[in-house]
From Swiss-Prot:
Cellular component per GO, a single term: cytoplasm
Summary of subunit composition and partner proteins: Interacts directly with FtsZ.
Purpose of the protein: Contributes to the efficiency of the cell division process by stabilizing the polymeric form of the cell division protein FtsZ. Acts by promoting interactions between FtsZ protofilaments and suppressing the GTPase activity of FtsZ.
Compartments where located: Cytoplasm
GO biological process, alphabetically ordered: division septum assembly; FtsZ-dependent cytokinesis
Keywords: Cell cycle, Cell division, Cytoplasm, Septation
First-listed, main subcellular location of the protein, grouped into a coarse class: cytoplasm
Protein name, per record: Cell division protein ZapC
Listed HAMAP family: ZapC (MF_00906)
């Protein structure tokens, strides 16, 4: 079941837990996966889930429509994406982990899904804030192994140079050449 935003939803930063939460009702809260070090604001606040938030929520849900996620997984990724767009501070690209595929002509679109390739694996990301040279992304794969010791889990937020983004439709052909 897909959750539908309503006027009671509120973003809350819990100083004690150092966590951003989405208060969905009196007895249900969603803990956002964005780590405190990536948040722009780290003091207590409460803010309504806005119309812009709802618009992003439904746009991202639509963009993930063709992917084989369960409804809870889809909602989790999308809520984390909306929170990241709204509350993350500017991130530095860590593109050195990813192979340069240089297959993108132009700027990626909001919600567009791309594959990325590292020395260890490949995975999929969704654009949550497009840029002309680099874009803010959310990991939609279960995980992306960056090196022997570091990986990004699903719903992790990262900034990538656009030259690292492999159009999703071209990924199968590109990856078969690597094998």
């Amino acid at each position: 079941m897909i959750l539908l935003p309503d006027e009671n939803w509120r973003w809350v930063f819990d100083e004690q837990r150092q966590s951003l939460l989405l208060d969905l009702s009196d007895d249900m809260q969603f803990v956002v996966s964005v780590p405190p070090k990536q948040l722009a604001q780290k003091q207590a606040f409460t803010e309504h889930f806005s119309l812009d938030d709802s618009s992003l929520y439904f746009h991202f849900l639509e963009c993930l429509g063709e992917f084989p996620f369960t409804d809870p997984e889809r909602v989790q990724i999308v809520l984390n994406a909306v929170a990241a767009v709204k509350y993350t501070r500017p991130l530095v690209s860590q593109s050195w982990y990813y192979r340069d595929v240089d297959m993108l002509s132009g700027e990626p679109e909001l919600g567009e899904v791309f594959s990325v390739v590292t020395e260890f694996t490949y995975g999929d990301v969704m654009i949550i804030s497009p840029g002309s040279n680099a874009s803010l992304c959310i990991v939609i794969s279960q995980a992306i192994q960056l090196d022997a010791d570091k990986s990004l889990r699903q719903s992790s937020v990262c900034k990538l140079m656009n030259s690292k983004l492999l159009p999703y439709q071209a990924a199968t052909q590109y990856l078969s050449k690597m094998a």
